[in-house]
């Protein structure tokens, strides 16, 4: 595989507590929380360490965003649930945490002619009047890459950092195969 490094920019993880939550009671008891039902149907609970935001919904679902590694994402969800459990002792000890999306960035180190890439590379969308990047969809791993003329890449849709890395590596190799960039 080609040598390219990725940087994880954001991880989105979710958890289902299996119990509905009384947000009007929880909101005033938490620090660093935003709760405005007219603007958003849940609480936004911000943690400083790890620096994340947890979206807490009345259905008992949580979404954590902002972590840079899976461990921090899991830690943030557990910290959030522990805070909620202080207010509601019926919150189950066991719950499933699912990684929903990993966003990573990379730099191919080469300028890309996106017009040529759009013509030669399969499964792409490129409309420069609407968005400056080219959208490239891979099926294995199932990720979407945004390619920019500068050679910078954003990979989204991965469930693991390895999937994001593999997506970027496969993309670079395909661009080399098609003579769209040099090795």
UniProtKB/Swiss-Prot annotation:
Where does the record place its sequence repeats?
Answer: 8-84, 99-175
One GO biological process this protein is involved in is: DNA-templated transcription initiation
Keywords of this protein's UniProt record, alphabetized? DNA-binding, Repeat, Transcription, Transcription regulation
Domain of life, source organism: Archaea
A GO molecular function term, named singly, is:
DNA-binding transcription factor activity
Q: CDD domains given for it?
A: TBP_archaea
Q: Which family does it belong to?
A: Belongs to the TBP family.
Query: Could you tell me what this protein does?
Result: General factor that plays a role in the activation of archaeal genes transcribed by RNA polymerase. Binds specifically to the TATA box promoter element which lies close to the position of transcription initiation.
Q: Name the chain's protein.
A: TATA-box-binding protein
- State which gene encodes it: tbp
């Amino acid at each position: 595989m080609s040598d390219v490094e990725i940087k994880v920019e954001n991880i989105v993880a979710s958890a289902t507590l299996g119990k509905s939550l009384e947000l009007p009671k929880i909101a005033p008891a938490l620090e660093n929380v935003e709760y405005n039902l007219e603007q958003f149907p849940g609480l936004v609970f911000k943690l400083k360490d790890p620096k994340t935001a947890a979206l807490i919904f009345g259905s008992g679902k949580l979404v954590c965003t902002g972590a840079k590694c899976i461990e921090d994402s899991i830690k943030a969800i557990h910290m959030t649930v522990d805070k909620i459990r202080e207010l509601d002792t019926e919150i189950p000890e066991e719950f499933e945490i699912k990684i929903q999306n990993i966003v990573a960035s990379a730099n191919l180190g080469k300028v890309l002619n996106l017009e040529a890439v759009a013509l030669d590379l399969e499964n792409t969308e490129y409309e420069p009047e609407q968005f400056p990047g080219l959208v490239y969809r891979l099926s294995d791993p199932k990720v979407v890459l945004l390619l920019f003329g500068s050679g910078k890449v954003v990979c989204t849709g991965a469930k693991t950092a390895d999937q994001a890395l593999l997506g970027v590596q496969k993309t670079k190799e395909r661009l080399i195969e098609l003579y769209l960039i040099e090795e």
